Amino acid sequence: MQHNSYRRWITLAIISFSGGVSFDLAYLRYIYQIPMAKFMGFSNTEIGLIMSTFGIAAIILYAPSGVIADKFSHRKMITSAMIITGLLGLLMATYPPLWVMLCIQIAFAITTILMLWSVSIKAASLLGDHSEQGKIMGWMEGLRGVGVMSLAVFTMWVFSRFAPDDSTSLKTVIIIYSVVYILLGILCWFFVSDNNNLRSANNEEKQSFQLSDILAVLRISTTWYCSMVIFGVFTIYAILSYSTNYLTEMYGMSLVAASYMGIVINKIFRALCGPLGGIITTYSKVKSPTRVIQILSVLGLLTLTALLVTNSNPQSVAMGIGLILLLGFTCYASRGLYWACPGEARTPSYIMGTTVGICSVIGFLPDVFVYPIIGHWQDTLPAAEAYRNMWLMGMAALGMVIVFTFLLFQKIRTADSAPAMASSK
């Protein structure tokens, strides 16, 4: 990073932890669905409604979150978002009725998506110039994973200390998350700088955001290239959530063992592979995050080909685990780098937030359709056919990533060569 390196690393860690754990109460169902039904009195259908309420609101708010990131103080927005999310969590800990929970979920979407999502990514990206984006975003993704994993393990330990029928157990977990959010919000106030100061540190022209910039962002080809790269990688991320089902149904692995593999892939790999992608861009000959994603996508495509070949006659569970882990590595390393692509493409800082918001809307669309499609295959087809279709979907997604990283890198190379040509004249 640049001047005052230690403070910037601390700032990056605080932003990353905040951005990572802030979603945990909104997605409480992922770990605590049974306790939610038992202690909060919701049916599984109602819990599904609670989740979909947040998801729909999030999709709507991704694009406006970019405008927020470009118009308002990063320090004030991140601090406010974390503290308000913590206060909402304290309300959630009272075990409110369904209509209140739905309102809380909408409020969570406002604080974590509208106020925090694009702001946190832009604030992190401004901690370095375009050549440092791979390192910054890689470590951001890894630190997010560390924060999520650490807090999840701690709250699970606290939850396990209570009797199975003690309703205080879930309440305590929610309160712990809420207090952590508020404390992180306070830390953000002292460590996160306002975007005006960061622009000055990077010697960039201070420009105010205008409504016409939204259309300008949509007219920039690299916005669409970055969006489609994220779209493809996120499709693989969604597919990996079925790894537990795949190992149990196709290889006969026990549910407990497969669940541990799910933790390794979804928690540990997220913490390790994001920084690893940044390290590759920093210390290898391939300095470009876009090129690294392309190489990882080729490796992922070969892995999916192997999974497709072994799908019809699975025999070695070790091979199945190895291939899933390899696919997980390519996915999480790419996730740690894809937000570096707009910065590498020299997106101006004054529209970086809007770019992130638009890329989020397009790139995260697989979150809407992948799960229903794969679920339909699982319900209507034999397991082997369902997972064959899933691997084919993944291959199509990575093929798209390879194409759009090629197009994006061509644009980046052209932009990099322009200053050199100008200086030689």
Swiss-Prot record:
UniProt entry keywords in alphabetical sequence: Cell inner membrane, Cell membrane, Membrane, Transmembrane, Transmembrane helix
Lineage start: Bacteria, Pseudomonadati, Pseudomonadota, Gammaproteobacteria, Enterobacterales
GO terms for cellular component: plasma membrane
Cross-referenced PANTHER family: MAJOR FACILITATOR SUPERFAMILY TRANSPORTER 16, ISOFORM B, SUGAR PHOSPHATE EXCHANGER 3
Protein name (database record): Inner membrane protein YqcE
Stated family: To E.coli YihN.
Species per Swiss-Prot/TrEMBL record: Escherichia coli (strain K12)
GO molecular function: transmembrane transporter activity
Predominant cellular place of this UniProt entry's protein: membrane
